[in-house]
């Protein structure tokens, strides 16, 4: 298929710039994936679509405050560093601006010197392998010095950094939030659990590639960025049991889907304890083996994520739903409203 086939017109004012005061006060569009029927509801109505014996699968990753501002020791030049992926030990793959100022062997100091880095290797497109030195615990130092790397379409400063984290996130490692999970509160999850729905966690660390435009014309030529995932033995067994008993597996977010489908596609539809790196690209024509339904936000035109949701329903129904969302003034992208495809 052509990437252009996944385009739609989106007025800029519908791109949500800030989160709502109450996480659960967002709207929820409910789409029947087979018939294309649409219902306009509120997010708390999601409870009525989840039944006893179903699984609600959430991604428990946490976003790192991964944007750092430092000084090049040799010249005093201001340097911006974005952490992308942890390598061996204290070495990280990073994106550096301006990259031309940081060559192999250059050193950078952040804050009052609590964090330092040396460039080990130069990569293309401004990428650098930096090795960090610090006292104490790296993630605690990062919490003090780092900023949340908000998506490029969000122009406003975030007043409360916790609003770009899910309430249940605990595994540090993402460069972006698994945004479908931002709608849940502990109270809402407790009500869902009380109904007999099993709440199960997976981990996928979201990379910045999630915002990267698709730069090919034909979707079959697109290569996905790689992201780290992990599924525990307990979670795998619980999901397999639910599926065997006829329960639905409802994924919260495209990251949860990508984790489950990566594993299921390798093991004849079964889930097993596994961790590794996935480059799975789900687009129309893909046969889902693990997931029955999806809670997700509204995605960018021509993105791999709108291709994924089109695979779960079909392209025509998804684009019709997106046009309805525009007409009804739904809020789009990371801080926007939600969609339930079932």
Curated annotation (Swiss-Prot):
It catalyses: 7-aminomethyl-7-carbaguanosine(34) in tRNA + S-adenosyl-L-methionine = epoxyqueuosine(34) in tRNA + adenine + L-methionine + 2 H(+). One of its GO terms (cellular component) is cytoplasm. InterPro entries: QueA, QueA_dom1, QueA_dom2, QueA_sf. Pathway: tRNA modification; tRNA-queuosine biosynthesis. The keyword S-adenosyl-L-methionine applies. One of its GO terms (molecular function) is S-adenosylmethionine:tRNA ribosyltransferase-isomerase activity. NCBIfam families: PRK00147.1, queA. Belongs to the QueA family. This is S-adenosylmethionine:tRNA ribosyltransferase-isomerase. It comes from Listeria monocytogenes serotype 4b (strain F2365).
